[in-house]
């Protein structure tokens, strides 16, 4: 697929600390967070002017789904815009708590596990052609996705009966099968529920739910772009060595528990291979594929970072990517803190730091502290992120949705939208179906807008 549509969904962890007598349940905290949204959207499930969807998911987790993007830098900017929008709701909610005499602070974490062991996700979406063999795509992709954590995990201190352990991935402990149509009860690597949000005869949406939520822009870019490159290679029928894993679920945990990337996992054919070996093979195949087909500046940057991350893991010299890869940046931060204060990995203060890395409040979160000190690399500017809060991508269907919502709100018209429908509720027959996610211009939508 020459042009691909991408989307990213992040669920956020919510917690609240109280200094007074009055305590709120997570549900009540979520209601405070979404009060402003409900006041204008009449619902806690809304689409925004930038084409994105914002809603309260199961278990009081706010979720932000980016608009459709056909450019990965746009996608990184829109993912970060989601953080900024939620940070605004958080500041608003704290203000409202104070006005009501409740002494408390609300925290939003862009991570994947809470202290009670619950997991919430980061879901990646890649549009693929319907005519390909989805089973074959999944077969080649799963070994890549299981081992990809060593280049784009978010890192986590895992408390076990045998003591604390620093893991590469947050989600690895919570994945229970390879391919499935459920997303919550049995968390698979690839979700097969067939909801393309597009013309179902032409397209399918590959829904990857194994990944960690990333704070680092560069890690997010590497996660998405490496997967896109592997997909392109599969779509071009490039032959691959068979890395089918005997037990992907055991493998994903074993790899997460090994920062060296060297632990061997069993393959279905009886051989063994390490995460480093499997990733190197995918990288080499992608590199020679790109040498033949060409790539842009972003692609070159991603291939260089992918290569350097594998070198850092293999050599043990993690400083090579400490400014770019989440799990490494966090590990280095925790190690410095432990050395300074003489703490063990199982110390509650280390657990607190582990969590605070993911705090999206820019004056509190440790990731943002590192970024403000110039210790984390960027791929998009603050201006681009700010614009993405209100302006949809201009080259996809999201533009149509965003323009429609903006105009309907300005004209105070009652409307309903989802990923494919735009509807004015006060005119019985005024619904436009937008089945092509690549289409940013549509006369029918322009007419609908002009008629307001």
Curated annotation (Swiss-Prot):
Known pathway: Protein degradation; proteasomal Pup-dependent pathway; Protein modification; protein pupylation
Annotated active site: 57 (proton acceptor)
Taxonomic superkingdom: Bacteria
Binding of Mg(2+), residues: 9, 55, 63
Residue numbers binding ATP: 53, 66, 419
GO BP: any one term: protein pupylation
GO terms, molecular function: ATP binding; ligase activity, forming carbon-nitrogen bonds; magnesium ion binding; ubiquitin-like protein transferase activity
Keywords: ATP-binding, Ligase, Magnesium, Metal-binding, Nucleotide-binding, Ubl conjugation pathway
Transmembrane segments: none
Any matching Pfam family: Pup_ligase
EC number(s) on file: 6.3.1.19
Family, per entry: Belongs to the Pup ligase/Pup deamidase family. Pup-conjugating enzyme subfamily.
HAMAP family in the record: Pup_ligase (MF_02111)
NCBIfam families per UniProt: pupylate_PafA (TIGR03686)
Protein's name in the database: Pup--protein ligase
Species name: Thermobifida fusca (strain YX)
Gene for this chain: pafA
């Amino acid at each position: 697929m020459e042009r691909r549509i991408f989307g990213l969904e992040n669920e956020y962890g919510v917690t609240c600390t109280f200094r007074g007598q009055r305590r709120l349940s997570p549900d009540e905290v979520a209601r405070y967070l979404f009060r402003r949204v409900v006041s204008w959207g009449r619902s806690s499930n809304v689409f925004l002017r930038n084409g994105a969807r914002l809603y309260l998911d199961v278990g009081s987790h706010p979720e932000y789904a980016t608009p459709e993007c056909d450019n990965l830098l746009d996608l990184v900017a829109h993912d970060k815009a989601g953080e900024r929008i939620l940070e605004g709701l958080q500041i608003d909610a704290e203000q409202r708590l104070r006005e009501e005499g409740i002494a408390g602070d609300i925290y939003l974490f862009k991570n994947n596990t809470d202290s009670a062991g619950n997991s919430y996700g980061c879901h990646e979406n890649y549009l693929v052609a319907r005519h390909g063999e989805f089973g074959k795509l999944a077969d080649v992709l799963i070994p890549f996705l299981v081992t990809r954590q060593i280049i784009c995990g978010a890192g986590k201190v895992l408390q076990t009966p045998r003591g604390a352990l620093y893991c590469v991935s947050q989600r690895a402990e919570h994945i229970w099968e390879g391919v499935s149509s459920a997303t919550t009860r049995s968390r698979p690597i690839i979700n097969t529920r067939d909801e393309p949000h597009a013309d179902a005869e032409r397209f399918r949406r590959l829904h990857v739910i194994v990944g960690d939520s990333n704070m680092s822009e560069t890690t997010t870019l590497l996660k998405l772009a490496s997967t896109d490159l592997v997909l392109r290679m599969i779509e071009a029928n490039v032959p691959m060595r068979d890395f089918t894993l005997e037990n992907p679920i055991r493998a994903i945990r074993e790899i997460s528990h090994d920062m060296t990337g060297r632990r061997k996992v069993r393959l279905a054919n009886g051989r063994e291979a390490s995460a480093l070996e499997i990733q190197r093979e995918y990288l080499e195949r992608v590199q020679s594929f790109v040498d033949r087909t060409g790539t842009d500046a972003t692609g070159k940057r991603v291939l260089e970072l992918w290569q350097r991350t594998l070198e850092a893991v293999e050599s043990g010299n993690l400083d090579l990517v400490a400014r770019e890869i989440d799990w490494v940046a966090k590990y280095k931060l925790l190690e410095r803190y432990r050395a300074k204060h003489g703490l063990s990995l199982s110390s509650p203060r280390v657990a607190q730091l582990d969590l605070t890395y993911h705090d999206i409040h820019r004056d509190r979160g440790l990731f943002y502290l590192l970024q403000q000190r110039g210790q984390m690399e960027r791929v998009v500017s603050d201006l681009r992120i700010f614009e993405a809060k209100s302006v949809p991508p201009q080259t996809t269907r999201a533009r149509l949705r965003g323009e429609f919502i903006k105009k309907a709100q300005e004209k105070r018209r009652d409307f309903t939208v989802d990923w494919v429908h735009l509807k004015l509720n006060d005119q019985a027959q005024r619904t436009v179906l937008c089945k092509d996610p690549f289409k940013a211009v549509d006369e029918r939508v322009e007419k609908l807008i002009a008629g307001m």
